[in-house]
């Protein structure tokens, strides 16, 4: 699919991006698909460049025909992933060059989803479908600021969260023949806004390098994670079942969300 999937449907491929596509699964086939991916990241701060490489199991999915015009799919997909560890150093004051700082950034873990979905074709050319997913995982992020001058306190902040909740996705596809060898498919998807019910925790430690004393602060924000309304639309042209041209557009409505740290953290500081 090469990233285009809202309007894509084939009898021998699993398209979990739009659950309406499951209705096209071949009645004599059990489909199984798995994929891996690699990622190379480049970080640049104050002229210092770092590279990071990682590989992930992208997905494991399957699909089969349950009844006439009805297909079923299930699988495990990544929702997000975090993985980095790098540091940068520089002078606190570029003119005097007496003291320097080191900032260290670390992050790991990620979120995953296990889903099951149905796709049904009530009339020729029109398919509808839905996925229900269980979303789970955790993440950790740490930012540490340290200094060569013992009079300057070092600071470490750790951010963590654990999520376990559901996610819903709905899809529609409509295919219309426009000539003897050409078809056009319109695909639509919608995912409703949903609060994942998980809390976000922050733990801060300020260390005095002279006497080793610690000053700690922590706070937790309840129901800190929400998924926005997500709407997608796509159009695909299929010529003679030999080649396809498609275009997808997805909108995530993040403007409805409050600023998490600025607006809510002060209410939970302890």
Task: Mark where each language-model region is.
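Outer-membrane beta-barrel porins/channels
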Residues: 47, 65-270
């Amino acid at each position: 699919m090469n990233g285009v999937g809202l309007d894509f449907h084939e009898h021998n491929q699993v398209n979990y991006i739009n659950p309406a596509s499951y209705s096209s699964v071949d009645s004599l086939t059990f489909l199984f698909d798995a994929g891996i991916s690699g990622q190379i990241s480049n970080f640049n701060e104050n002229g210092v460049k770092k590279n990071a490489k990682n590989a992930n199991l992208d997905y494991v999915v399957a699909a089969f025909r349950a009844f006439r015009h009805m297909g079923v799919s299930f699988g495990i997909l990544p929702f997000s992933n975090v993985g980095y560890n790098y540091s940068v150093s520089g002078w606190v004051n570029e003119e005097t060059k007496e003291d320097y700082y080191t900032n260290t950034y670390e992050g790991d873990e990620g979120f995953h989803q296990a889903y099951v979905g149905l796709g049904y074709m009530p009339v020729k050319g029109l398919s509808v479908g839905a996925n229900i997913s269980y979303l789970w995982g955790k993440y950790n992020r740490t930012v540490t600021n340290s200094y060569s001058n013992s009079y300057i306190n070092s600071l470490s902040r750790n951010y963590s969260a654990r999520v376990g909740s559901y996610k819903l996705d709905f899809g529609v596809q409509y295919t219309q023949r426009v000539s003897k060898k050409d078809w056009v498919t319109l695909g639509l998807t919608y995912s409703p806004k949903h609060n994942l019910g998980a809390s976000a925790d922050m733990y801060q430690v300020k260390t005095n390098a002279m006497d080793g004393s610690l000053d700690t602060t922590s706070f937790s924000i309840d129901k800190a994670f929400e998924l926005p309304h997500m709407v997608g639309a796509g159009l695909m042209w299929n010529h003679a079942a030999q080649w396809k041209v498609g275009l997808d557009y997805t909108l995530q409505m993040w403007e409805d969300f409050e600023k998490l740290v600025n607006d809510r953290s002060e209410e939970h500081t302890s």
